A protein has these predicted regions:
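Compositionally biased amphipathic helical and low-complexity segments enriched in hydrophobic
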Residues: 7-10, 178
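Acidic/histidine-rich catalytic neighborhood of metal-dependent amide-processing enzymes
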Residues: 117, 123-188
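Bacterial N-terminal signal peptides
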Residues: 1-7
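Acidic/His- and Gly-rich active-site-bordering loop/insert found
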Residues: 12-120, 129, 139-148
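Short linear interaction motif-like sites in intrinsically disordered regions of transcription factors
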Residues: 5, 16, 48, 104, ...
Length: 188
């Protein structure tokens, strides 16, 4: 209804504050070395879990029994209609190892130079993970109740197309995913 849209317009978040918070979260996340190889994403999963917990968003972590360095995190923003399959926001936690000689900054310090954040994973793909996370945080803060559940899935092992990434989650935990749509770096 028009009242709903007017309420959103006049009660919209402080977008400058949202941008500042997003930048700070991205910088923190970029400082977590999740290079693959070796593929140890435990600190990345712990960091994501901490942020979800701080914002009261339900999440679950999954350890790969064959390789405990590989973990995944699934957060959920519940919808009002349990008959609808969820929208899955998919991203990966691991990054390609940094060639320090090719960097003019420390790739794990997330420096801002001339308005640009420099850090391993800034483009591929920790920035998308933060955008997806911030979407859930903002929806929760604004009191939005989606009809369809929205899930955030951060996975390991993408950079080497390993067997313990999203394929492992599909094989072992499809019942927790089962999405209608998946939104990742390639689109919807």
């Amino acid at each position: 209804s028009i009242t709903y849209f007017l309420n959103i317009l006049y009660a919209a978040p402080d977008w400058e504050q949202v941008e500042n918070k997003s930048v700070e979260l991205l910088r923190q996340y970029l400082k977590v070395d999740t290079s693959n190889p070796p593929g140890d994403v435990r600190k990345g999963v712990s960091w994501l879990a901490k942020i979800f917990k701080e914002h009261g968003i339900k999440y679950e972590t999954f350890k790969v029994p064959d390789d405990p360095r590989r973990m995944h995190i699934l957060a959920e923003f519940p919808g009002t209609n349990p008959d609808l399959k969820p929208l899955l926001l998919l991203n990966h936690i691991d990054v390609v190892p940094a060639d320090y000689d090719a960097w003019s900054t420390d790739p794990f310090q997330a420096e801002i130079i001339d308005g640009i954040i420099y850090g391993r994973g800034a483009l591929d793909m920790k920035s998308l993970g933060i955008m997806q996370m911030m979407s859930l945080i903002l929806l929760k803060e604004e009191g939005f109740k989606p009809e369809r559940t929205i899930k955030f899935l951060g996975v390991a092992d993408e950079e080497i197309l390993g067997q313990y990434g999203v394929q492992w989650m599909i094989k072992n935990h499809w019942n927790k995913l089962d999405p209608e749509w998946v939104w990742d770096e390639g689109g919807l």
